[in-house]
Amino acid sequence: MEMNGGYAAFFSRAGIPVVHMSYLDDVMRKLSSVAFPVKHTQYDTFQRLQDHFDPELKVHARVAQVAGELVRDLSDSLFLPFNLLDYAQLLRDLYFSLHIHMGSLGHGLDLSILDSAVQNFSAAAFAFHLRQSNLDTSDPMAIRRVNDQLLLLERAFLDPVGLPQNPYKKHIVLSPAESPAYVDEMFPGITDEFMRFLDQLGAPEDLRPHAATLHKHYHLLVQTLVQAADSLAEVVPPQATPSH
């Protein structure tokens, strides 16, 4: 998914799940970086679209049909089709990348607490889906509770303060990093501070403020992952008050 797309604010600021759809033929796949070079310019007009890209709007019609079918499928699904184990794997991959790049840098970060938080989230995701598979599907409120937890999970990854270099980006896992990273993908806030730290190595500038920001955001990241895992815990409904 294009992390800097026009819809990025939905998940990076508001924690709202999004889906990205596009059409690429064989030619456009080879030119994927310039498939629509006039996008977001003054030449991005409906007339140019008809003249050069989709004269009969056939592609737009097909994509709209796919989108409509997706909406129908979501509406008909008993549970939101979110696999939290995929999210757990993403966190594991980001941690692994961080472990590799931070291992050779004198950062003083205790990576074991992040490892523990990621493992805790993985266990919580597995337990959540296990409960989901054994749920009484005749209980509409039980289904509602599970779907609410699935839908609101993204918001558990929001930090009200935002990323260290961009307070408007609140999602500490999926927000795009500010700086172009020349390393493997890591957590966005960590990536930004890591790149700043590397850029200043060997320079006369004092690195302690950068290191302090890195440590502060790192511990906030760990705390947020723990809270996200807690949000997947079983929700016990209040007992009904017996009538007299």
Where are these regions (language model features)?
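Secretory-pathway/membrane protein signature
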Residues: M1-H244
